[in-house]
A protein has these predicted regions:
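Bacterial N-terminal signal peptides
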Residues: 16-28
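Aromatic (phenylalanine/tyrosine) cluster motif
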Residues: 4-5, 20, 34
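N-terminal secretory signal peptides that target proteins for export/translocation
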Residues: 1-12
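Generic alpha-helical structural signal
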Residues: 7, 24-25, 79, 343
C-alpha cells in the first residue's frame, strides 16, 4: 500500500505540474494575442524587379520627385527631378550646377517643395533647408545648418532638424533639435522636447498629433523608429509593436505606415492614432531584394495604393547626398510586385509623390 500510494502521489504531482504549465502557456498565448504585434503571413515576394508591364503605371495620376546626381551643364551635381509615375517626362526642377539640391518633399496640396541645399566645398560646406514652388521658381531659404524637412498636414508649417555640428557632416543622424517653421509668420519654434537628437527621416502624422522618425544612438536608443508627441514631450518606441528599422512614412489618411526593416526588406502595417500612443497591427513585408542590393526611402502615394522607394547595389550610400551609382526609383503596388521607373542609375534616391489637389481618388485630409 505504501508503494502504491507513493506512485499515485507522484503521478498526481506530475499531472498537477503539467496542468499548471499548460495554464501558464494558455495565459501567455492570450497575453500575446492582445499585447504583442500582430504579424500577418508574408505575401509572395520577388527579390528582383518585375517587368514594367506588370504594374499599370500609366494609370497612376501622380508625379514623383527624387534627388539625382548627374551632369548639369557639363558639371556633376545633385539636382531635384520630377517624373511621371511611369518614368516619363523627366524635368530638372533646380538646374543649379554650382549647388547640390536633395531630399525633396512635396507640400500636401502639391504646389510647393521643401528640400535641402549643400553649398560650399569640403568641411566648409553648409546644408540648409529651402522651399520653392513645384515648378522650381521662388526659392526661399528658411534655415542654415539644417536638414531633412517635412510639411505639416495643412501645408502651413515646415518641420526640420538642426545640424548637430557646425562643421559639415553627411551622417543622416547628425541632428540636435526639432524645429517648426511657420510660413505665415516666419517664426522658428523649437519642439517642446528639447532633448530630441540623432533623429532623422521625420514625418508629420495627418492628424497633426505625432512626428514619426528614426533614431540612431540618441536618447538611450540604438536604432529604432519613434513616435514623438507633436505638442508634448512623450516619445514611444515602436518596436513593441513589431516595428524595427528606419525611415517611416504614413499614408495620407493616417491609417497605414511603411518603413525599411533592413537594407533588404520594406514593410507596411496598419496604424491606430486614436489613443494616447500609436498602435501598430498587421505588420507585413512587401518588398525583399537580394543581399547584393539595398532598398530604402519609402513613400506612400497620395491614394495609398502604391509605395515608391530607392533600389540599387549594396555599395551605394543611402544617406542624403551619399553617392549611389546604379540606384533607381521603383514603385510597388503592395502585392509583392515592384518595378523600376528609372533605369539610368544616376544615384536616384529619396522619391516623394506629388499630390493632386483636385484628385478625388483619395480621402481628404483630417480636419
Amino acid at each position: 500500500m505504501t508503494r502504491y500510494y507513493s506512485i499515485t502521489k507522484s503521478w498526481l504531482q506530475e499531472a498537477g505540474i503539467t496542468v499548471f504549465l499548460s495554464l501558464l502557456l494558455i495565459l501567455g498565448m492570450i497575453d500575446d494575442a492582445f499585447c504583442e504585434p500582430q504579424i500577418q503571413n508574408e505575401i509572395r515576394l520577388k527579390k528582383m524587379p518585375s517587368p514594367r508591364d506588370e504594374i499599370n503605371l500609366e494609370k497612376i495620376p501622380f508625379k514623383i520627385l527624387f534627388e539625382t546626381f548627374r551632369d548639369t551643364n557639363g558639371r556633376l551635381n545633385w539636382e531635384i527631378y520630377q517624373i511621371n509615375a511611369d518614368g516619363s517626362n523627366q524635368v530638372n526642377l533646380t538646374q543649379t550646377p554650382d549647388l547640390d539640391e536633395m531630399y525633396p518633399h512635396a507640400s500636401p496640396d502639391g504646389t510647393k517643395v521643401c528640400f535641402v541645399v549643400d553649398q560650399g566645398k569640403g568641411r566648409t560646406k553648409v546644408r540648409s533647408v529651402y522651399y520653392m514652388n513645384i515648378d522650381g521658381t521662388e526659392r526661399v531659404k528658411i534655415a542654415i545648418n539644417a536638414r531633412q524637412p517635412c510639411w505639416s498636414p495643412d501645408g502651413k508649417k515646415i518641420a526640420y532638424l538642426r545640424g548637430e555640428y557646425e562643421r559639415y557632416s553627411t551622417r543622416e543622424y547628425a541632428t540636435s533639435e526639432l524645429v517648426i517653421y511657420d510660413m505665415q509668420t516666419g517664426r522658428h519654434k523649437p519642439h517642446p522636447n528639447t532633448s530630441l537628437h540623432h533623429i532623422y527621416a521625420i514625418c508629420w502624422s495627418p492628424d497633426r498629433n505625432w512626428f514619426f522618425a528614426a533614431v540612431h544612438g540618441g536618447m538611450e536608443f540604438s536604432d529604432a523608429i519613434l513616435a514623438i508627441e507633436a505638442n508634448g514631450t512623450g516619445v514611444f518606441d515602436m518596436e513593441r509593436w513589431g516595428v524595427r528599422g528606419c525611415r517611416p512614412d504614413l499614408s495620407r489618411d493616417g491609417k497605414r505606415m511603411t518603413w525599411g526593416e533592413t537594407d533588404w526588406d520594406l514593410c507596411v502595417a496598419d496604424i491606430d492614432l486614436s489613443g494616447p500612443e500609436p498602435k501598430i497591427y498587421n505588420v507585413q513585408k512587401i518588398v525583399r531584394c537580394l543581399l547584393a542590393a539595398k532598398v530604402y526611402h519609402v513613400d506612400f502615394s497620395p491614394d495609398g495604393k502604391y509605395i515608391a522607394f530607392s533600389f540599387g547595389p549594396a555599395s551605394g550610400g543611402q544617406q542624403v547626398g551619399g553617392k549611389a551609382s546604379g540606384w533607381n526609383i521603383c514603385v510597388t503596388d503592395l502585392s509583392g510586385k515592384w518595378v523600376k521607373i528609372t533605369t539610368d542609375g544616376n544615384h536616384n534616391k529619396e522619391p516623394d509623390w506629388v499630390p493632386i489637389l483636385s484628385a478625388e481618388s483619395y480621402e481628404k485630409e483630417p480636419q
